[in-house]
């Protein structure tokens, strides 16, 4: 149905207009099409447009670098996308309305911002208690995918719970305010029964159906135990998926996420739980993000993770793989997966679960450990670490090489240097374990101790041994250290190493 454009027609015809001629042609082509005009004549330019020509003229103008209207505001190169109210699937709008925000609208806005040359980053301004599970996981995956193109940050202002927490976790960085509420990583389902009310009213409803589960959960009868059990299994699976997504996006372990037991964290406690990165005033969010982006453009680094935080997350990832339930009986494969950069705990668990358990071995001590503790390694720890890291090296091959190498000058042992670190104070037990790790260096120990300061958790002897074995085989510092020590006296050792198969 043609729109009523009488007010525009009245202003456009028989009235003086201040229009540039080329744009005037486009304007009247567009208006003529809306009026149902079959043609447009411009005598001064000797141009005649028929109906298809009017459409082509309008389309050509719109395609000539004219971007579609934005559905977000841009401040300092930051596109601010509001995410408020209940989150729903297929709302059909790009802006929140009637207390709801659609997952489809969030994705559409993000895609538009990614294509907008004036947008350097996106800030999701979130104030939502959550919403539907339907569509939530796909939306979160899209946020995670699009953040590879431009930074996407989340501001919890002041609530980002449940489904909103899922979306926030998919962002590059999460900001919280002093009174923010974040978390609630869990799933719920409700059932209503009108059976008692109908009985009192004398109403009897008979459901006629085909298929044993066709009317499961209907509101006309009390919930049967077997149906309740099925529903419980469904929400347990959904919670597991929820936790795995948050863990993948944030770098936390699944156990750490599920360990929150759907608790809600306020302000600083959200950061301590690993669900947020920085506490700010909501009014400063845009300037904080813009400053970070400016720093990155100038060659600085995005203040997303300090070196200590990065080391802590990497250690958590490694230990999450080595100590997960699926790694039992598959320790060798778990160690290999832990050494793969970017391998998440969830991905490793899936691979381990599909793999057959490895055959048990007679000894739990690795060949690398045997090389490091042999008598000939005393005073030659760096060379021993180099040998221990070599494929197919055995203690029998290493001993004559170590014996032929001169011992290092007497000085503080690696253990003494590590134990003397400031970071070792209050963490002596962990420092002792690090000092015993094959291939460990003072700087590596310092970083690990700093990352674990005040947060170390007791681990079993088998877990410690497994972690030490991983460090022995995946520490580049050990190999570099061995090479760096080659001098005139060590040339023979290097030549002997190079000649080995």
Swiss-Prot record:
Gene Ontology molecular functions: serine-type peptidase activity
Region (3 X 38 AA repeats): 321-455
Protein name: Head-tail preconnector protein GP5
Lineage top rank: taxon: Viruses
Ranges occupied by TRI repeats: 321-358, 371-417, 418-455
Keywords: Hydrolase, Protease, Repeat, Serine protease, Viral capsid assembly, Viral release from host cell
Keyword Hydrolase: yes
GO biological process: proteolysis
Active-site residues, record numbering mapped to chain: 162, 214
Species, as recorded: Enterobacteria phage P21 (Bacteriophage 21)
Family statement drawn from the similarity comment of this UniProt entry: Belongs to the peptidase S49 family.
EC numbers for this chain: 3.4.21.-
Gene: 5
Lineage: Viruses, Duplodnaviria, Heunggongvirae, Uroviricota, Caudoviricetes
Protease as UniProt keyword: yes
Function comment: Scaffold protein GP6 forms the scaffold for capsid assembly and is required for binding of the 5 and 4 protein products. It is subsequently lost from the head during maturation.
């Amino acid at each position: 149905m043609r729109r009523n454009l009488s007010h525009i027609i009245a202003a456009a015809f028989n009235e003086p207009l201040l229009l540039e001629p080329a744009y005037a042609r486009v304007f009247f082509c567009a208006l003529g099409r809306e009026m149902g005009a079959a043609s447009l004549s411009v005598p001064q330019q000797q141009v005649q447009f028929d109906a298809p020509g009017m459409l082509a003229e309008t389309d050509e103008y719109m395609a000539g670098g004219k971007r579609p209207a934005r559905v977000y505001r841009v401040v300092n190169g930051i596109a601010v996308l509001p995410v408020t109210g209940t989150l729903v699937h297929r709302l059909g709008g790009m802006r929140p309305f009637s207390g709801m925000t659609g997952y489809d609208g969030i994705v559409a806005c993000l895609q538009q911002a990614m294509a907008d040359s004036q947008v350097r980053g996106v800030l999701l301004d979130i104030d939502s208690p959550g919403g539907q599970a339907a569509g939530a996981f796909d939306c979160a995956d899209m946020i995670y995918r699009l953040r590879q193109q431009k930074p996407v940050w989340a501001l919890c202002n002041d609530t980002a719970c449940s489904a909103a927490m899922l979306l926030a976790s998919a962002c590059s960085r999460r900001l919280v305010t002093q009174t923010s509420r974040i978390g609630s990583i869990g799933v719920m389902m409700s059932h209503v029964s009108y059976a008692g009310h109908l009985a009192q009213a004398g109403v009897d409803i008979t459901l006629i159906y085909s298929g044993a589960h066709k009317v499961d959960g209907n509101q006309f009868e009390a919930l049967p135990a077997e149906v309740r059990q099925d529903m419980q299994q469904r929400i347990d699976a959904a919670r597991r998926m929820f936790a795995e997504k948050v863990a993948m996006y944030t770098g936390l372990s699944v156990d750490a996420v599920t360990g929150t037991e759907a608790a809600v964290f306020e302000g600083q406690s959200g950061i301590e739980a690993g669900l947020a990165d920085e506490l700010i005033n909501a009014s400063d969010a845009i300037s904080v993000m813009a400053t970070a982006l400016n720093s990155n453009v100038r060659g600085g680094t995005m203040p997303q993770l300090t070196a200590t935080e990065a080391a802590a997350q990497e250690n958590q990832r490694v230990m999450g793989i080595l100590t997960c339930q699926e790694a039992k009986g598959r320790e060798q494969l778990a160690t290999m997966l832990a050494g793969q950069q970017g391998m998440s705990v969830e991905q490793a668990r899936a691979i381990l679960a599909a793999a057959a358990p490895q055959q048990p071995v007679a000894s739990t001590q690795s060949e690398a450990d045997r090389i490091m503790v042999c008598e000939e390694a005393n005073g030659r720890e760096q060379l021993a670490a180099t040998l221990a890291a070599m494929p197919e090296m055995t203690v029998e091959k290493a001993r004559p090489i170590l014996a032929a190498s001169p011992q290092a000058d007497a000085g503080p042992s690696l253990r003494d240097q590590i134990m003397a670190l400031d970071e070792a104070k209050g963490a002596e037990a962990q420092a002792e374990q690090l000092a015993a790790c094959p291939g460990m260096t003072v700087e590596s120990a310092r970083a690990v101790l700093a990352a674990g300061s005040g947060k170390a958790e007791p681990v079993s002897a088998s877990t410690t041994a497994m972690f030490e074995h991983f460090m022995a085989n995946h520490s580049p510092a050990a190999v570099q250290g061995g090479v760096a020590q080659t001098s005139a006296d060590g040339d023979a050792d290097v030549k002997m190493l190079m000649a080995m198969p």
